[in-house]
Amino acid sequence: MTVRSLFLLPGDGIGPEAMTEVRKLIEYMNSAHNAGFTVSEGLVGGSAYDAHGVAISDADMEKALAADAILFGAVGGPKWDGVPYEHRPEAGLLRLRKDLELFANLRPAICYPALAAASSLKPELVEGLDILIVRELTGGVYFGEPKQIIDLGNGQKRGIDTQIYDTFEIERIASVAFELARSRDNRVCSMEKRNVMKSGVLWNQVVTETHAAKYKDVQLEHMLADAGGMQLVRKPKQFDVIVTDNLFGDMLSDVAAMLTGSLGMLPSASLGAPDAKTGKRKAMYEPVHGSAPDIAGKSIANPIAMIASFAMCLRYSFNMVDEATKLEAAIANVLDKGIRTADIMADGCRQVGTSDMGDAVLAEFKALSA
């Protein structure tokens, strides 16, 4: 039997409640389908700070490095607003990304048919929307040096951030995008600002060269990032996979997420490079939503983003494509039946809590897996 190791980091706020619903799915898959998941759990964020004085302990970091995949809930809350900057809850997430070398952030923007009316765009523009934004996560202006504020001595200050990309960073993120496109609609749109940024010129060149060398079967289009943002809200279904840098990816993925009408339901994945010996990638999966401390502990949080993150884990870390597809279909079926948590409640639907929503998805998944 294949052994698949999962390390769960529920975190703070609604993270633990949402993770409980994923545990139900894992337990079912192990008992009914001999999936072979081994599960361990650790602390991250504010809960780790309360227990260990840091946002993630070295011991839990070792467990994360050893796992096949990590499921991450959410971190943060007003309780920890006064902790030292280096120990703030978000530092745990940043350390995970850094130490695991997770350079590729995958942000799907999927519009479930039952929620199309909740989008800020006309339903016909977004119904059936399925975009995947591949964002470079460890380079660019967020990490480039120098990064500082200088006192110019004349009553003025100067803020400096540096956008830096090396060839290998662009090659590897482009390769991820092209490979993912092959399992989708086989189209990639690369976005940068080559008209005003030298890093954009290099980005365009390297993506073009990578495409010509290895991925000629994939359709490639280039678009300036500002034009890309406009096209996302004008005609979003023209896109399949979008690949872009850290800064533009941060912005464009949030724009795309809002097209779905359900920002709090979207998953994400962060991937590292394949291991030279095993071919496996380090990977972490997490919902896009935050810790929502205002509703934590009230059993009203929506667990769908966490469940959908587990579906991404099945697909990308364990190549359990059939199971991932069925789990995603189970979510859609539940929504089609009018079952809703408070955040997505609509007229004519039935409101349920966190556990009941998780149970409804599990029941649909069982029916599809029978």
From Swiss-Prot:
Q: Which residues bind substrate?
A: 97, 107, 135, 226
> Which compartments is it annotated to reside in?
Cytoplasm
Per its record, the protein catalyses: (2R,3S)-3-isopropylmalate + NAD(+) = 4-methyl-2-oxopentanoate + CO2 + NADH
* MF (Gene Ontology): 3-isopropylmalate dehydrogenase activity; magnesium ion binding; NAD binding
Entry GO CC: cytosol
Q: Does the keyword Manganese apply?
A: yes
Where Mg(2+) binds, per the record, is at: 226, 250, 254
EC number(s) on record?
1.1.1.85
The subunit structure is: Homodimer.
NCBIfam families given in the database record: leuB (TIGR00169)
Q: HAMAP family from the entry?
A: LeuB_type1
Q: What's the family?
A: Belongs to the isocitrate and isopropylmalate dehydrogenases family. LeuB type 1 subfamily.
Name of the protein in question: 3-isopropylmalate dehydrogenase
Which species does this protein come from?
A: Agrobacterium fabrum (strain C58 / ATCC 33970) (Agrobacterium tumefaciens (strain C58))
This chain is encoded by the gene named leuB
